[in-house]
């Protein structure tokens, strides 16, 4: 895995690790957890933790892995931005959804362009997948906009982020907030 990561073959390294942990005893899984923390692979930690949890084995550290974005200064609470990033991408900065949402915060291109204009930076499609800080900045600015729109209600903000503000408004009208 180290050689794969060092040679830029991140996807193969991640695949190797997720398959390897299927055969490891708990003590070696704990060693793998430390390795993944050292190599700053929180999204692989989440994958390992979820896979083991589905088998009835609990490794809380990887299941609740934190991302370095916790140390950044964003316009919304860290808990909200981390929860959205973990749910949307499992902290994988390279993931693209079937509908085109991209990066750690899974932002749709049109929304990302709008947020880039709002903060005065150039929209760069490539950076959406290669620079998690850029992606997180645009995503958290969008979360801030939604928080202002929905009165900082975390449920409605989360629904709006995932399904769009119109659906969140319809849901709120139908079910109350």
Please report, for each region that a protein language model flagged, where it lies by residue:
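Cell-wall glycan-active module
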Residues: 1-156, 163-177
